[in-house]
A protein has these predicted regions:
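Structural motif
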Residues: 153-164, 206-213
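Membrane-interface aromatic/basic loop that binds lipid-linked glycans or pyrophosphate carriers
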Residues: 27, 178-241
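Short runs of predominantly hydrophobic/aromatic residues within well-ordered alpha helices
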Residues: 101, 140, 144, 162-166
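Donor-binding/catalytic cores of nucleotide-activated saccharide
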Residues: 6-112, 119-136
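Amphipathic alpha-helical repeat scaffolds of TPR domains
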Residues: 163-175
């Protein structure tokens, strides 16, 4: 079983390569890397080095913080015995794919990763995930809270999910800090949620030597409102964590 978003497409070798990786690894699911495509900018990017190497990850070592970790349901091939008993949460408009993947991972013994960019992900500025602010944009944070709960019995994985959740809180705040409705109703709440996973996030930044990012995260932890004002004063910027 595999999912492809209507806006995206896959490499002609996607099915064969993923099936081979699943069989060789003995894993319950396998994921590949995405080729991110900004059609409006004529840019593309992937973290894949295209070696085709297959890496096997035990479920209790899955790291939601690590750069090469997968966090969405597409670009994955699932064994039927895992996927058939797990449903998408219909109450979530954004993030339901992340939660679905998390539940499948939790039900697995092993996860495999193949180092090829076989999934072509089109980034649309007007999509549900992007576009202007609405209250449903915060569904992504609810999904990540649920991901953290899924791994309550696997502390190491849960801590990595908490770091991932803190990152999403900061990204949501950066993206919508110039929206009046977001600032009036949700910004303070998002800051409170960010702090729940911020210490784990800062620990991770130090572990990987991202000292500048650690200091930025530390500043936003202690001075959330001041950090938001700094983001608001920027006329244009790339979304950064």
């Amino acid at each position: 079983l595999s999912f492809v978003d209507p806006d995206d497409y896959v490499h002609p070798e996607y099915a064969g390569c993923m099936k081979e990786a699943l069989e060789k690894s003995g894993a319950e699911l396998v994921y590949c890397y995405a080729m991110d495509i900004w059609a409006s900018k004529g840019k593309s990017h992937t973290v894949s080095t295209e070696t085709g190497e297959i890496t096997v990850i035990p479920m209790n070592q899955y790291d939601w913080f690590e750069e090469k970790t997968h966090a969405v349901s597409w670009g994955v091939l699932y064994r039927q015995e895992i996927a058939k008993n797990i449903l998408f949460q219909g109450n979530l408009k954004i993030g339901e794919d992340t939660l679905y993947l998390a539940e499948c991972i939790h039900a697995s013994r092993k996860i495999a990763r193949v180092d090829r960019a076989l999934y072509y992900y089109y980034i649309n500025d007007d999509s549900v995930t992007n576009g202007r602010y609405s209250e449903k944009k915060l569904d992504e944070l609810e999904a990540w809270r649920c991901v953290c709960k899924v791994f309550e019995d696997v502390p190491q994985v849960q801590r990595s999910a908490q770091a991932g959740y803190a990152i999403r809180c900061r990204l949501i705040a950066i993206k919508y800090c110039k929206d009046d409705e977001f600032m009036a109703k949700e910004c303070s709440k998002v800051g409170t949620e960010f702090r729940k996973g911020a210490k784990e996030l800062m620990k991770r930044w130090l572990q990987v030597g991202r000292y500048g990012t650690f200091l930025k995260t530390l500043y936003s932890y202690y001075f959330w409102n001041s950090w938001i004002r700094l983001k608001q004063r920027r006329k244009t910027y790339e979304v950064e964590i």
